[in-house]
Amino acid sequence: MTERTLVLIKPDGVRRGLVGEVLNRIERKGLTLAALELKNVDDATARAHYAEHAEKPFFGSLLEFITSGPLVAAVLEGPRAIAAFRQIAGGTDPVEKAATGSIRGDFALETQENLVHGSDSPESAAREIALWFPAL
């Protein structure tokens, strides 16, 4: 079944020049880019995207990080796109949970600045795509 997912290459990935590497891995996995845009994120979009974390102690630093510079937002399509991207992304904690060979396992150094975000369910993918790409 073909599905869509939202992927963000976060500001640390853009700053470190890893956009091409991430896109290469996405394409090698067989996923298709349906939309791609370099964006500077405003506070309202950041708050809406991370609303589920609003009451957590790290929310402020998360907002500060995600708005600290440009990021790349993309919509990917393909069979089981959500699970496929999450597999190549690796675990959220790049040191303890991300396998070598995954994006985070190979390039990320800490949990918050872990290079990429990928939707975790069809429901969150629909919500996130509508937020980042309202015309789709």
Swiss-Prot record:
Which InterPro entries does this UniProt record tie to the protein?
A: NDK-like_dom (IPR034907), NDK-like_dom_sf (IPR036850), Nucleoside_diP_kinase (IPR001564), Nucleoside_diP_kinase_AS (IPR023005)
Tell where it localizes. Cytoplasm
User: What residues form the catalytic site here?
Assistant: H117
Necessary cofactors:
Mg(2+)
Principal place of residence: cytoplasm
What EC number(s) is this enzyme filed under? 2.7.4.6
Q: Does the keyword Metal-binding apply?
A: yes
Instruction: Report a single Gene Ontology molecular function.
Output: ATP binding
Q: Which reaction does it catalyse?
A: a 2'-deoxyribonucleoside 5'-diphosphate + ATP = a 2'-deoxyribonucleoside 5'-triphosphate + ADP; a ribonucleoside 5'-diphosphate + ATP = a ribonucleoside 5'-triphosphate + ADP
Q: Which Gene3D superfamilies match?
A: Nucleoside diphosphate kinase-like domain (3.30.70.141)
- Which GO cellular component term is one of those annotated? cytoplasm
The alphabetical list of record keywords is: ATP-binding, Cytoplasm, Kinase, Magnesium, Metal-binding, Nucleotide metabolism, Nucleotide-binding, Phosphoprotein, Transferase
Q: Does the keyword Kinase apply?
A: yes
Q: Where does ATP bind?
A: K10, F58, R86, T92, R104, N114
Regions annotated as coiled coil: none
| Signal peptide residues on this chain, from the entry's feature table | none
The family database entries (SUPFAM superfamilies) matched by this protein are listed as:
Nucleoside diphosphate kinase, NDK
Which top-level group of life is the source organism from? Bacteria
* Swiss-Prot/TrEMBL GO biological process terms: CTP biosynthetic process; GTP biosynthetic process; UTP biosynthetic process
Q: Which family does it belong to?
A: Belongs to the NDK family.
Q: Which purpose does this protein serve, as stated in its record?
A: Major role in the synthesis of nucleoside triphosphates other than ATP. The ATP gamma phosphate is transferred to the NDP beta phosphate via a ping-pong mechanism, using a phosphorylated active-site intermediate.
Self-association or partners: how does it assemble? Answer: Homotetramer.
Alphabetical list of HAMAP family matching this protein: NDP_kinase (MF_00451)
Q: Mind telling me which PANTHER family this protein's record contains?
A: NUCLEOSIDE DIPHOSPHATE KINASE
- What is the protein name for this chain? Nucleoside diphosphate kinase
Lineage here is:
Bacteria, Bacillati, Actinomycetota, Actinomycetes, Mycobacteriales
